[in-house]
A protein has these predicted regions:
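Active-site beta-strand->loop->alpha-helix modules in alpha/beta enzyme cores, enriched
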Residues: 1-65
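The feature marks non-catalytic terminal segments
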Residues: 54-222
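Short, solvent-exposed loop/turn segments enriched in Ser/Thr/Gly
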Residues: 236-243, 283-284, 296-302
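Short, solvent-exposed loop/linker segments at beta-strand-coil boundaries, enriched for Pro/Gly
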Residues: 262-268
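Terminal connector regions
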Residues: 293-328
């Protein structure tokens, strides 16, 4: 989000919502799961959620609502606020926790407008993907009709969504257009959230795990599926970064001890030990751990314990799946 300039992208996405006036918004699941390490996918879900909650608010990017009154003002948008009616997410993870959280569709069903199966529509669209898999895509383009038909085993199957928000009547697993009627609905501002107060001396898991927890609270989507404990998939032999947010809101200097418990084969690179904290200060700390190169099918659990003055402040557990290949941690 920092690299993409979040504010600028949010403005553009809200402009697009006001321009096209969608009844339903469908986007990536904003969360951190095994199988969900794609930072750009998660960022898209964050921006779409913000657009759902803000495009109907006339106080958000009001310049988009200004219309031309002079000859030289032709670049003004003259748009109107627009409140979408439903928000759905689709996960990239195959975890069972997503079952029953929204409608399910068979991708071998026929797309009426296109007169081809849904999987085939996805297959054809994928050919225009420009940033990845170019060699693979060139191979797809060379397939004859028989070879394309054989791709159903790879592209067909079941597709499902997770209902994030609905401002109209309907069921959780009903069709995405269930309850939708043409026309505007009133803007529904997300209720304000009272975050928990930090203890005078506290430690919490930061990074994407901490962000998505707060993001879901802020946008009232805390009921979305989430892992039983923080989790991630990394490449065997890679480094695991555990971000910690440390807070000393007392008037005295404090020492916090970070201890790491891990399975055999893992090694601590940095971040464990004693950390001095100045009075009324906040620190952003990282524990770096090297994963073993040996193959293992079982998930590994890493445990970080923070203590001070003889008391445990926090015990943070992360479930790690080691793979042959993996995306960079972000």
């Amino acid at each position: 989000l920092a690299n993409w300039r979040q504010g600028e992208l949010e403005e553009e996405l809200i402009r697009m919502v006001r321009l096209t006036r969608p009844e339903v918004i469908i986007t990536w699941m904003p969360g951190f799961f095994v199988g969900e390490n794609h930072g750009d996918h998660q960022a898209a879900g964050v921006l779409a959620t913000e657009a759902f909650d803000s495009a109907g608010d006339p106080a958000v990017f009001p310049a988009q609502l200004a219309g031309p009154v002079k000859v030289n003002e032709t670049l003004l948008d003259g748009l109107q606020p627009w409140q979408a009616k439903k928000l759905y997410y689709f996960p990239d993870s195959a975890d069972d926790i997503f079952k029953g959280t929204g409608p399910t569709y068979q991708t071998n069903g026929m797309a009426k407008a296109l007169k081809i199966p849904y999987w085939r529509a996805g297959f054809e669209t994928f050919k225009y993907h420009l940033t990845q898999y170019r060699k693979f895509i060139e191979g797809l383009k060379k397939m004859d009709e028989k070879q394309v038909a054989e791709q159903e085993k790879n592209w067909g199957g079941e597709g499902s969504f997770t209902l994030g928000k609905s401002l109209v009547p309907g069921s959780v697993t009903g069709d995405v257009f269930e309850g939708i009627t043409p026309g505007r609905i009133a803007f529904v501002p997300p209720a304000r959230v009272a975050y928990e107060e930090f203890a005078e001396l506290s430690v919490e898991l930061g990074g994407p795990w901490g962000f998505y927890e707060k993001f879901r609270q802020a946008h009232r989507i805390s009921k979305l599926p989430k892992a039983k404990e923080p989790e991630i998939a990394i490449k065997r032999g890679a480094a695991l970064t555990i971000p910690l947010d440390l807070h000393n809101h007392t008037d005295a200097a404090k020492n916090i001890t970070i201890a790491v418990k891990m399975p055999d084969g893992w090694t601590t690179e940095s971040g464990a030990g004693n950390l001095p904290l100045d009075p009324q200060s906040d620190y952003y700390w990282q524990v770096l751990i090297d994963a073993p190169k040996a193959e293992t099918k079982e998930r590994q659990e890493i445990e970080c314990t923070a203590s001070a003055d003889g008391k445990t402040l926090a015990t943070i557990k992360i479930s790690v799946q080691l793979r042959n290949g993996g995306l960079p941690q972000n």
